A protein has these predicted regions:
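C-terminal hydrophobic helical "lid"/dimerization subdomain
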Residues: 1-2, 270-274, 278, 314, ...
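Short Gly/Pro-enriched turn/cap motifs at secondary-structure boundaries
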Residues: 21-22, 54-60, 133-137, 143-144, ...
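Glycine-rich beta-strand-centered segment in the early N-terminal region that forms part
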Residues: 23-37, 47-97, 102, 154-158
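Hydrophobic beta-strand signal
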Residues: 31, 64, 83-84, 178, ...
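Cysteine-cluster motifs in flexible loop/terminal segments that predominantly coordinate metals
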Residues: 87-150
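Mid-domain Rossmann-like dinucleotide-binding core that forms the NAD(H)/NADP(H) cofactor-binding site
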Residues: 143-144, 150-152, 156-241, 245, ...
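Glycine-rich cofactor phosphate-binding loops and adjacent beta1-alpha1 units
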Residues: 182-186, 208, 221, 225-306
């Protein structure tokens, strides 16, 4: 057992930083001493009750740190390795075998819902009582994480783990969605709806492909300014402008060939679909409550429009995360412009700032 501290989500939604104990890693697992963890909107979904994760429980799924212990049958990872943590998968189903682990047949229980390891056991306790963990195969809002081997990506020993922590989910999702799914080219008009961490990452990713237009849509002026700084060619302020009319004006009536809705809001998805060009595609991610529906005008999509969903950017973390690390090292992925750091004991302030829109990507330092 390893003693540590963690931010525990209670049944009433409060977050209580508590002393906890971590079991030794089992087969296919490693114990990571965390340096930092990014706060993601999926975490907020749990706190709001929209994602049914058991309580008391530990969430957090953008961990970064160094390996302390290695379980049986783990290959290629050793104590002392610097690592970034992402989502987990089974590695054996058809989706995993075809290098689409975000669509693993057991993705939901392994990452979101059960709070238990794949074998049904726990691993974290507080005052002798079990605490749910294994969120995205890690549960990283604490000093340590028991992480699945398949969620672990090794990085250079001198990597700045605090800066790189958000690569495991938010940035991965933005880049993966843009590069793996939408794949913009020089004749495309791209619109990104929502200028949070996922959306701004998508703006950076799209800008590297140099589409003819790259438009960011949001309600927060400071985020729109940041989108322009990161490569957007135009912005739309949804708090004061008619988004559909403004997009029609910006595109000369052509419409948006590639839209990416990062908000998880059905009204935004409908706006994006209405604004899409003939044979345009709208990609949707986000974590709305189960049962959330999008209203679609069937006549409006008969021009070949496509509405498509995506999870985790359809990315394999062990492939994309090293590319993102290299982009950051080359100065082409300015993560520092998105981040603000908070101590573990100040995690509720980080949550409040993210809700308010004053911080794009809070990073919790362990």
């Amino acid at each position: 057992m390893t003693a540590g501290r963690a931010a525990v989500v209670e049944a009433d939604g409060r977050i209580v930083v508590s002393d906890v104990e971590y079991a030794d890693p089992g087969p296919g697992e490693v114990l990571v001493r965390l340096t930092a963890t990014g706060l993601c909107h999926t975490d907020l979904g749990v706190l709001a009750g929209g994602i049914p994760f058991p309580t008391p429980g530990i969430i957090g799924h953008e961990g970064a740190g160094r390996v302390e212990k290695v379980g049986a049958n783990v290959r290629g990872i050793s104590p002392g390795d610097a690592v970034l943590l992402s989502f987990t998968s089974c590695g054996a189903c058809a989706a995993c075998a075809s290098v689409h682990p975000a669509y693993c047949e057991t993705w939901l229980p392994r990452n979101l819902l059960g709070g238990l390891r794949a074998d049904g056991s726990g691993g974290i306790s507080r005052d002798g009582e079990p605490v749910a963990g294994h969120f995205f195969g890690q549960s990283s809002f604490g000093t340590h994480a028991i992480a699945d081997e398949r969620s672990v990506v090794r990085v250079a020993g001198d990597a700045d783990l605090t800066v790189l922590a958000p690569l495991g989910c938010g940035v991965l999702t933005g880049f993966g969605s843009m590069w793996n799914v939408l794949d913009p080219g020089p004749t495309d008009i791209v619109a990104v709806y929502g200028a949070g961490a996922v959306g701004l990452s998508a703006v950076i990713a799209a800008s590297l492909r140099e589409p003819v237009q790259l438009i960011a849509v949001d309600r927060v002026a400071s985020r729109l300014d940041l989108a322009l700084e990161l490569g957007a060619t135009a912005v739309v302020d949804a708090s004061s402008e008619d988004v559909g009319a403004r997009l029609a004006e910006l595109t000369g009536g052509r419409g948006v060939s590639l839209g990416f809705d990062t908000t998880g809001h059905p009204g935004v998805a409908r706006t994006a679909l209405d604004a899409a060009a003939v044979r345009g595609t709208v990609l949707v991610c986000g974590a709305p409550p189960p049962g959330t529906e999008i209203g679609v005008d069937i006549q409006g999509i008969l021009t070949g429009k496509i509405l498509r969903g995506v999870t985790m950017g359809d990315a394999d973390p062990r492939d994309l995360v090293p590319q993102l690390v290299a982009l950051h090292a080359a100065g082409r992925l300015p993560l520092e412009k998105l981040e603000k750091r908070y101590a573990l004991d100040d995690i509720e302030s980080a949550v409040a700032d993210m809700h308010a829109g004053t911080t794009v990507k809070p990073v919790i330092v362990s």
